[in-house]
Regions:
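Extended, low-hydrophobicity, Ser/Thr/Pro/Gly-biased non-transmembrane segments
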Residues: 1-30, 57, 295
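Short, intrinsically disordered, charge-balanced linker/junction segments flanking boundaries
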Residues: 1-2, 178, 334-339
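Short, ordered beta-strand-loop transition motifs
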Residues: 2-8, 35-39, 285-290
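Well-ordered beta-strand positions in beta-sheet-rich domains
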Residues: 9-11, 100, 326-328
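Hydrophobic residues positioned within well-ordered beta-strands of beta-sheet architectures
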Residues: 10, 43, 312-314
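Hydrophobic alpha-helical and helix-loop surface patches within well-folded domains
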Residues: 12, 31, 42-297, 301-303
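Extended Gly/Ser/Thr-rich low-complexity repeat segments
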Residues: 20-34, 304-314
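Beta-strand-rich binding/interaction modules
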Residues: 266-267, 279-339
Length: 339
C-alpha cells in the first residue's frame, strides 16, 4: 500500500517460529529461477541480474536434497517456501536463514557444462549442508553455543548422505576419510580442543567454527552410525527432532534419543569423543599364541605420552583356511586381548 510522501507499507506473510539468529532480510535487484516443488514447498534460486543461467545445477541438488531429508528425517520441511540466494561478496560460505538461505556466489552458482568436478562437488555439498540445517539447527536449535557441533557436524554428515544418494557415481564416502584429514592433523596437536567445551564469551563461540566442529564432529557421528547401525541411528535422529521440534536441545538430549533406539548407553561410547581432546591410535598385534592384542593411546606428534581413553568400535576379520569371519568389539580399555 502506497502512502503520502513516497512511503509505502509492505506486508509479509507470517513465518514459522524461529530462532532470532535465523531471521534475514535480503533487499536488492535480484532475479528468481523458475520454481520447483517439493511437496507443498516452493523452491527457488535468486541471483543478481545476468546470472540466472547458472542456477540449474544448484536447483537440482537443492530439490533432490530437500526430498532426501524429508524422507530421512520423516518430518516435512517446516515451511512453505525455500529461497536460496547467491550474494556477491558474501562474507561466509553460506548461512542457513530459515526459508532464505544465503550463499557466496561460488557456493551456489555453477555452469554444469563447463564447471570442474571440484566446483560441482562444492556446490552440491554446500547446498545439501544448508538444507540439512532446516532441521538440525533451525527446527531444533542448540541450547547454547557450546552445542554448535549439533548443528554443524550433523549438517556435514547429512550433506554426505544426501549427495551420495543423489550422485552415487561420485563415491563421496570413498573420499570421506581423506577429506577429514585436516581435522586429524589439528587434533594431533597438544593444543587441540574437545569438540564441545564451555562458551563464556563471543570469542569462544567464534573459535568453534573450525575443522574440529565440522570434520571431526561428522566423523565421530559417522562412526556412531556404523556402530549402532544406519537404521537405528536414523530412528534416533527422528526421535530427537520430533521431541525437540521448535525448541532447544543439547548433547545430552541427542544421546537420550539415540539411546532409546539403540537400547544402549550412548554417552558411555560417545562422551570421550566429544568432551576430551585428541583421538586414539589403535595398534593391533598378533601374538605367537594367535591372540589379537589391541592397544590404544592418544596420538600426538610429540613423544611425550598424553592421557586419554576412548571407547573405540573395532571391526576385524579372521581367516582360517577358506573360512572368513568378521568380528566387532568395543575397545574400552588401554589393552584388550582377543583369543
Amino acid at each position: 500500500d502506497r502512502l503520502e510522501g513516497g512511503k509505502k507499507i509492505v506486508q509479509f506473510a507470517d513465518t514459522m517460529k524461529m530462532s532470532t539468529y535465523l531471521v534475514a532480510f535480503v533487499i536488492g535487484r535480484i532475479e528468481a529461477s523458475a520454481p520447483t516443488s517439493v511437496g507443498k514447498t516452493t523452491l527457488r534460486l535468486w541471483t543478481v541480474p545476468g546470472k540466472k543461467h547458472l542456477t540449474a545445477f544448484g536447483q537440482d541438488i537443492a530439490t533432490a536434497s530437500l526430498q532426501f531429508f524429508e524422507r530421512y528425517y520423516g518430518i516435512p520441511y517446516p515451511g512453505d517456501k525455500l529461497d536460496l540466494l547467491a550474494i556477491p561478496d558474501f562474507a561466509s560460505g553460506a548461512m542457513e536463514n530459515l526459508g532464505a538461505i544465503t550463499f557466496r556466489e561460488t557456493a551456489l552458482l555453477v555452469d554444469r557444462r563447463t564447471g570442474t568436478h571440484g566446483e560441482l562437488e562444492r556446490v552440491a555439498d554446500v547446498v545439501a549442508h544448508e538444507n540439512a540445517h532446516m532441521w538440525f539447527g533451525d527446527l531444533v536449535t542448540m541450547s547454547w553455543w557450546n552445542g554448535l557441533w549439533l548443528n554443524e557436524a550433523f549438517a556435514t554428515l547429512m550433506e554426505m548422505l544426501a549427495v551420495d544418494a543423489w550422485k552415487p557415481e561420485w563415491k563421496r564416502w570413498d573420499s570421506f576419510g581423506v577429506s577429514r584429514a585436516r581435522a586429524l592433523s589439528v587434533d594431533g596437536l597438544h593444543s587441540t580442543r574437545p569438540i564441545e567445551y564451555p562458551v563464556r564469551a563471543p570469542k569462544d563461540a567464534e573459535a568453534m567454527f573450525d575443522v574440529l566442529t565440522y570434520e571431526k564432529g561428522a566423523s565421530v557421528l559417522r562412526m556412531l552410525e556404523q556402530h549402532i547401525g544406519p537404521t537405528v541411528f536414523r530412528d534416533g535422529v527422528r526421535h530427537y527432532l520430533e521431541t525437540h521440534a521448535y525448541g532447544n536441545a543439547d548433547t545430552k538430549d541427542l544421546w537420550i534419543s539415540l539411546g532409546k533406539t539403540a537400547k544402549q548407553a550412548v554417552p558411555d561410547v560417545m562422551d570421550g569423543w566429544i568432551f576430551q581432546p585428541g583421538y586414539p591410535l589403535v595398534t593391533a598385534e598378533l601374538t605367537q599364541r594367535s591372540e589379537l592384542v589391541l592397544t590404544q593411546q592418544r596420538f600426538t606428534y610429540l613423544p611425550d605420552p598424553a592421557p586419554g581413553l576412548w571407547q573405540v568400535p573395532v571391526s576385524f576379520r579372521i581367516q582360517a583356511g577358506e573360512k572368513t569371519e568378521t568380528r566387532r568389539l568395543l575397545l574400552t580399555r588401554a589393552e584388550e586381548r582377543v583369543a
